[in-house]
Amino acid sequence: MKTFIKNYMKAVGVVCACMAAFPACTDMMETDSTTVGFEEDNRLDSPNDSLYSVLGILSQVQRLGDRYVLLGELRGDLMEATADAHVDIQEISNFSVSSGNEYASFYDYYNVINNCNYAIAKMDTNIVFYEDKVMIPEYAQIKVIRAWTYWQLALAAGKVSWIEEPVLSLEAALKEYPQKGLEDLAQLLIDDLTPYVGARALDYGTIDNFDSRKMFFPVDMVLGDLYLFLGRYADAATAYYRLIDKRKLTLTGANGYYWDNAARGSASGA
């Protein structure tokens, strides 16, 4: 994990160096140039800032999609790779992932986590409009995204580097961060998310003909999964019930299949 963070910061440094190599001639002599941005000058102190932060982080979460499905399903009981599958896919299915496996890189996971940490550190949750702390819903959602990403990373890697502050310098990248296994991490994430149970769910209306409410991670969904892993079944049931009740979720015949006793070889929609 530490090697990854070092490489991550080296890559960031190379990009910054390349950008710095081509300044305008006039800017080279001006120490007050407005084209230079400093970390301490960037605050997320308006509802628009928080909105764009959440959507930006979600765009990074999309990069985890293939790995999330493959690392989960290929190691499950109901799926296996064929002999014609790519070697990386076969390695996952056989629980023998090599260091060169395309899906073994955790760079994108830590990238999401680092951006979540940055937003969490910079968002001013004390801003009040009409007696409403307007930044809390986005702040809570970013915490949920970070928790989900950490959990998926831990399920894939077995343990993670627990980092709560944004890594913005080489010095920060070289620090020794505590390693957390699944049980310790699950409890840390539960403690981190519990204060935001009941936070207003995000709803940005329809975006490109898609209901934006379905883009976000329900806090009770993540909490339920964490409780379930720890064997706290009553707490898991409570979290899942809150989610079902709030969202008025129901199951109908369209969600199920049945087999009759005469012929189990074919299934029919209920």
What are these regions (language model features)?
Residues 1-23:
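Sec-dependent bacterial lipoprotein signal peptides
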Residues 4, 25-72:
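Membrane-proximal, proline-rich intrinsically disordered regions
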Residues 46-47, 51-52, 86-157, 180-183, ...:
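Conserved, well-structured interaction surfaces
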Residues 48, 52, 240-270:
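Extended ligand-binding clefts on enzyme/binding-domain cores
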Residues 115, 185, 192, 239-242:
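Alpha-helical solenoid repeat scaffolds, predominantly canonical TPR units
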